[in-house]
Swiss-Prot record:
Residues annotated as binding Mn(2+) 2: D50, E85, H170, H199
Protein name per the record: DNA double-strand break repair protein Mre11
Keywords: DNA damage, DNA repair, Endonuclease, Exonuclease, Hydrolase, Manganese, Metal-binding, Nuclease
Quaternary structure and partners: Homodimer. Forms a heterotetramer composed of two Mre11 subunits and two Rad50 subunits.
Entry function: Part of the Rad50/Mre11 complex, which is involved in the early steps of DNA double-strand break (DSB) repair. The complex may facilitate opening of the processed DNA ends to aid in the recruitment of HerA and NurA. Mre11 binds to DSB ends and has both double-stranded 3'-5' exonuclease activity and single-stranded endonuclease activity.
Pfam hit, one: Metallophos
Record comment: activity regulation: Nuclease activity is regulated by Rad50.
Binding residues annotated for Mn(2+) 1, in chain numbering: D9, H11, D50, H201
GO molecular function terms listed in the Swiss-Prot or TrEMBL record: 3'-5' exonuclease activity; DNA end binding; endonuclease activity; manganese ion binding; Y-form DNA binding
Entry coiled-coil feature ranges: none
Natural source organism: Aeropyrum pernix (strain ATCC 700893 / DSM 11879 / JCM 9820 / NBRC 100138 / K1)
Catalytic center residues: H86
Length: 409
């Protein structure tokens, strides 16, 4: 009976913080997934969107990705991928996934083209059928309308289809994340045995839903906020009345987070050194692999600071420790220099995330994430990533909001 390996949000080609080591980490994690599948031989590997981090990548990244997927298809293991927002270009064009589909027997990644119907997105693997929801890079209301249309037709197909039907999609459900949600759990096909979903980087498993569904989470944490909730590929056994899920533990580079508050005017070196000593003691006690730990140092301050000085002293505090350091900056609200604007009135510091959330009518945590991503991309001089983030915002914010922004005086 069918057994599938469900993975999502792989982001091949990503280079978090501009580190080539992190690019290699992500490929190493996906290689582990491939090796696991080759050993256990599931009936299919399902990739629920964002196999790639960008629609266009260096040829080196594409070549390595193709070689890994080919190892599965050459072994007779079908691989099905849904498109996500990261591997779908803004303009209607061929994608890296569609090019892979054309060149690899056994790899399917249906790409929506004008005139296609939902039935064209059902991949028949014999006793297992997979209904793939295409990703529509259009404004949110239109994406929601198109997605619901596919889900309704997949529901009809699921009621009459023989064998086991699984839904594969890269989308948010409103029960998990209101921001950019396109459907509710009740909209999932009632006759589907399981919905293999992607998009949420924090894992979710909901086997008690009317149609059981899960988000494996991000394969390798891309942000410091994700290191405590890493994802896990999921083995899903569909042979019984209800899916049985087993998490696959992926060996990863250890990542640690320390926060250093230098707002009290004390020694930057001493503050960083104390935090690093605590983490390094834990690293030495628990280290089991050959990869250098990545230590995120969160510098908190309520006043202007010399970033060059902080970086120099943080590196000095790390001494000869065999680690990777990433410095993050966090302005603490309420300080004298936390933020002012001569044209705005009100009490307290300027909260850009709150302003963006209220202005664009999106949740506060979503606004914070967007601003964080923009800051990281700008710091790394990644113009393409900046453009992609802005395009995501443009397709997420409602048309009424954009009209209000464009026509306000």
């Amino acid at each position: 009976m069918p057994k599938v390996l469900h993975v999502a949000d792989v982001h091949l080609g990503a280079r978090p913080y501009g580190l080539e080591e992190r690019r290699d980490d992500i490929f190493r994690s996906f290689e582990f997934v491939v090796e696991t599948a080759l050993k256990d031989r599931p009936d299919a590997v399902l990739i629920a969107g964002d196999l790639f981090d960008k629609p266009k990548l260096p040829l080196r990244d594409v070549k390595q990705a193709v070689e890994l997927v080919r190892a599965l298809t050459d072994a007779g293991i079908p691989v099905l991928a849904a498109h996500g927002e990261h591997d779908t270009p803004s303009v209607r064009d061929e994608t890296l996934l569609s090019l892979m589909e054309a060149s690899l027997d056994g790899f399917k990644a249906p790409l929506y083209r004008s005139g296609m119907r939902p039935g064209d997105f059902v991949v028949d693997l014999g006793s297992l059928k997979v209904a793939v929801v295409p990703f529509f890079k259009v404004p949110l209301e239109e994406r929601r309308r198109l997605t619901l249309r596919f889900l309704r037709e997949f529901d009809q197909i699921s009621r009459t289809s023989s064998g086991t039907l699984v839904l594969l999609a890269h989308m948010s459900l409103d029960a998990e994340m209101q921001f950019d949600a396109v459907a509710s759990p009740s909209d999932l096909p009632s006759g589907a045995k399981y919905a293999a979903l992607g998009h949420l980087h924090a894992p979710r498993i909901r086997l008690d839903a009317p149609t059981p569904y899960a988000y494996p989470g991000v394969l390798d944490p891309l942000k410091v906020e994700e290191i405590n909730t890493p994802g896990s590929p999921l083995y899903v056994d569909l042979s019984g009345d209800a899916p049985i899920i087993e998490k696959v533990k992926v060996p990863r580079r250890p990542q640690y987070r320390i926060e250093v508050d230098i707002g009290d005017g004390g020694s930057i070196y001493n503050a960083v050194n104390r935090g690093l000593r605590r983490v390094l003691a834990n690293v030495r006690a628990s280290r089991e692999d050959w990869l250098k730990p990545l230590i995120h140092v969160i510098i908190k301050s309520d006043k202007p600071i010399s970033k060059a000085r902080v970086i120099a002293e943080a590196r000095k505090a790390a001494g000869g420790a065999d680690v990777l350091l990433k410095i993050h900056w966090k302005i603490v609200a309420g300080g004298e220099h936390a933020g002012t604007s001569p044209g705005l009135q009100g009490e307290g510091p300027l909260d850009l995330a709150k302003i963006a959330a209220e202005y664009y009518k999106i949740p506060l945590n979503a606004a914070s994430t967007i601003l964080h991503d923009l800051a990281e991309a700008a710091a790394e001089k990644d113009e393409l990533r900046v453009r992609e983030i802005l395009e995501t915002l443009a397709t997420t914010v409602s048309q009424d909001t954009w009209k209000r922004i464009l026509y306000m005086r």
